[in-house]
Amino acid sequence: MSFSFHEKTFFDKYGVRVSLLEDEDFIRAASMLAEEVFGFGIYKESKGSGGRFYERCWLMGSEDVLYGRVHFGGQNNTILFELTGTGCGVAKEGWESRLFAFLTNAIRPKITRVDIAKDFF
């Protein structure tokens, strides 16, 4: 699953609790959001370019498993979250409702990709 929203959303969500002056400030806010919604946050910046036409990329999960990516920089001041199937599977219960509540109040929210699979055994 992938979704994006405008970076100004963090000003409304966190207000003065979070300094939002540098890219790293926005990434800290993105990690806080991921922790609140999914139960895991960002653990390191990815090497190389950001991908998806963004300037930079950060990884969610751990050294052993990738739960998703957060892309930031460029793209009309938006931030893009990409969750892997593993990330969706390990997210804390109720993440769908928490994400819906967040996106409902976000600035310029957009669900950019949803993958659905059905296993037949």
What annotation goes with each model-predicted range?
Residues 1-121:
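Structured, helix-rich domain cores that form ligand/interaction pockets
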